């Protein structure tokens, strides 16, 4: 991995129970802050911890030295009873905002979804599955078309909500059911 000189290294912490990760040596599973800190140190690059679903988990990642976290539940495939990332994002952002970059995935399908995620505390959003058909059909051009649509939708939403910049987007721009 180091030979490829990546800009960052990430570790997925919430998939240890998936069938293809069983019987690994060393075993996949929970890591203490100290173990995670050792991994971060060995990376020698900005380190991203993916699979954060609680403020406690986010604080552990910060304590271990992570540069960023990804609020992610693998689309509920790891445990079907996990909440949506949008439900937990505000409390996680409240716990660690400004100390680490906060990314979110899961359910991001449009520029409106990107707007909502920013309003809930994300610094950035990860989109995977929805873009695959565009890339499969048209390669890099398909990716560009998809991303242009997301950006256009985000700009339209920002204009409709009176938010001239990403920094102006906040919880007061969206309705949160209690």
Where are these regions (language model features)?
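Beta-strand segments within the central parallel beta-sheet cores of soluble alpha/beta enzyme folds
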Residues: 103-105, 169-170
